[in-house]
């Protein structure tokens, strides 16, 4: 871990980091998060019985769109040409959906924030589409799972076993 913050200038004011001289490399980031709900809500999602439509299809598209809009939402993020965004859903068969986002680029800076934002917007979309029947849903455990590429190299979240 580094202790130097790069988003401040010599006057201690915010700045966007200059990446002009950085090398273009292949960069990948994976993030994850969960939403826990009443078991009946999860069953209705699986059965296609949510009035707003296909929850997972809409949430998947929302997550992809979010990754593409990251630089418009997070002030110091660079506009990055993404080469791929994929959203995956798994559930425990009871009350929790896990969302994983994989984001790729070939550029001068990483896509960790894009992956994290994709997960968060995907989860918020699930919440939005199901809130009429379950306002007690809990969004949690959002974190970067893995990132690779660039000067800082490879990172794996400490509690994630390496495969």
Swiss-Prot record:
The active site is at 128. InterPro entries: MoaC, MoaC_bact/euk, MoaC_sf, MoCo_biosynth_MoaA/MoaC, Mopterin_CF_biosynth-C_dom. Keywords: Lyase, Molybdenum cofactor biosynthesis. It catalyses: (8S)-3',8-cyclo-7,8-dihydroguanosine 5'-triphosphate = cyclic pyranopterin phosphate + diphosphate. CDD domains: MoaC_PE (cd01420). It is an enzyme of class 4 (lyase). It comes from Lactiplantibacillus plantarum (strain ATCC BAA-793 / NCIMB 8826 / WCFS1) (Lactobacillus plantarum). Homohexamer; trimer of dimers. This is Cyclic pyranopterin monophosphate synthase.
